Amino acid sequence: MASNEQEALSMIECAKKNHVVLLEAMRPDFDPAFDMIKNALPRIGKIRRASFEFCQYSSRYDRFKDGIIENAFNPALGNAAVSDIGVYCIHSLVRLFGTPKNIHSMSSSLENNFECSGIVLMEYPDMIAEAIYSKVTVSYRPSVIQGENGSILIDYISHPTQIELRLREGSRDPINGGIKEILPYSPVNNNMIYEIKNFLSLVENNGIEHEYLQYSLDTIRIIDHVLASHTSVH
């Protein structure tokens, strides 16, 4: 929504002053898959670990390697990898588990000091979460939430198309008696339609102050912390 917390606060203040709706277009927030994941959490027992991953090789990276620096890799534009795609992982973790009590991070940078990939460890009272992101590599691993009785696997954190529940041996699910289940979710071609529907609903109902603003602020504070304190590796 903004490149730092102060910008975000200014935008929120301006929106309220002018009685207009401000909403970050965070795709996972409004996808029905998110509620399905949230509702499945009790089935895997006490949550101990979550690992959300979004590593996508940028189509512009090859041009960067040829010496052509486009906006996607220009550090002056405030679009570091953590802000561009790491935000999907961090925001989803904040939505599900709240703000962490401690944050640790490490990032890699390109020759022009552009932050291109990294990992953010988020410490909670009873669990640890990690956000893994990159604009210069690709990953095929799912994002995972691990509980004492099983795990939830999400194929793409930014736009889920399959959500799988796996329970450990000896912890058969009381709902269907099994230990593996593909949750009944039917993805659409473009899940941006859900954020548009929610935005229209907020506008129609004069929803100037809404819960999503706080999620955006909590997320950008974490990103600010990462960019201010990360250890850069070239």
Model-found features: residue ranges?
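C-terminal helix-rich "cap/oligomerization" subdomain common to oxidoreductases
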Residues: 198-234
